[in-house]
């Protein structure tokens, strides 16, 4: 740990990384506070901040020669086979670490790799290469299985802990597995933090963007007070301020042969309203809608829009255009609505629900990976990050209020490299609730723009359903309204 006065140059360097956010650190009294320029307090500067050679310091950090926490079950013949681009990442990491060791810098690296790159298998290769006892920390239980599969493939002795950390500590008194796979809430236990700081050299923080290290979280406190010897942050969408805790980044672009298409399913609805909708509309401008809760609630009861989503999905699925579908909503009740209606149409052998409240969901996810055709309905919270179903070929985004980081993570669910190259995303930029019409259009345009500009999708208009089904809910009141709607859509592309 390094307690330092907040001199101007140090403050400026740290503040620059927050990209306008408040800079918060632990002070000498152990309080997590916002750092003000010229403060007389001393602050705990994260070890990982010094990983970058651009940060000038006279501090000297421990090297791996000071510990003996080596993996005992390692077998070089079990090392996973990597693609050329993954091998390039390994080469970059090894080269950077040599330089860090020579200059006595902390061995902290952020692997900023695109969704579908294969971060898990690449990191397992690095883990086996280092030969050091490792803790893999994941934000939720859903990510455990993909790590378990890869760690077992490498042949490393491991222990998984997703429930009580107290029972894990008792087990660690008699055994010390080479690899611990834990959920991040374990880091709320100081005794556990002290144990892994002493007995494990490598710490892997998976999906590091899910943690805001400018907040006083368990992960923030662990990295500040119990900094590991080596550390990897894994993410496809780095959170800029987190760089303060891991200030060395490797980013290698992934060239892809995938054919990625995003369809904006345009339609014009007659205004739709109910007593419930009118009641929620009154709350749109109030403090209760600060995070657009009521915006999403209104979408969940927008019956014409919901029917359009179902009609589009059913037609595409029945035609065989798409086969392995992920349907994403923001709210649980919206998820349940789609699940029940699709279940009535296709049955339980095809339709599955990714419900965070059901403990069997992770096992169900494993079981559908080998299916040729399925529809998986879930929420953004549960399946937007880290969902491990590589065979997904299509995504229906039913919600609207999604930030850029969530958008990129969500689209990444259908960008995994497989033998099948076609990937399709469907968004629905219109609503029958006039009070949120333009708001939804703007949010949807952000999704489309990011997918095209950053992730290589090609945008196309989807009109097949409206043209082929005269009884569809996508009705127009007049020819003039249809023309005006097309003009509005063209202006917002």
Curated annotation (Swiss-Prot):
Residues 100-256 form the Helicase ATP-binding domain. The keyword Transcription applies. Its main location: virion. One of its GO terms (cellular component) is virion component. InterPro entries: Helicase/UvrB_N (IPR006935), Helicase_ATP-bd (IPR014001), Helicase_Restrict-Modif_Enz (IPR050742), P-loop_NTPase (IPR027417). ATP binds at residues 113-120. It comes from the Viruses. A motif (DESH box) lies at residues 206-209. Its EC number is 3.6.4.-. Keywords: ATP-binding, DNA-binding, Helicase, Hydrolase, Late protein, Nucleotide-binding, Transcription, Virion. GO terms for molecular function: ATP binding; DNA binding; helicase activity; hydrolase activity. It is found in: Virion. Belongs to the helicase family. Poxviruses subfamily. DNA helicase which seems to act as a postreplicative transcription termination factor. Involved in ATP-dependent release of nascent RNA. Forms a stable complex with single-stranded DNA, and to a lesser extent RNA. Interacts with G2. Might be part of a transcription complex composed at least of G2, A18, and H5. This is Transcript termination protein A18. It comes from Vaccinia virus (strain Tian Tan).
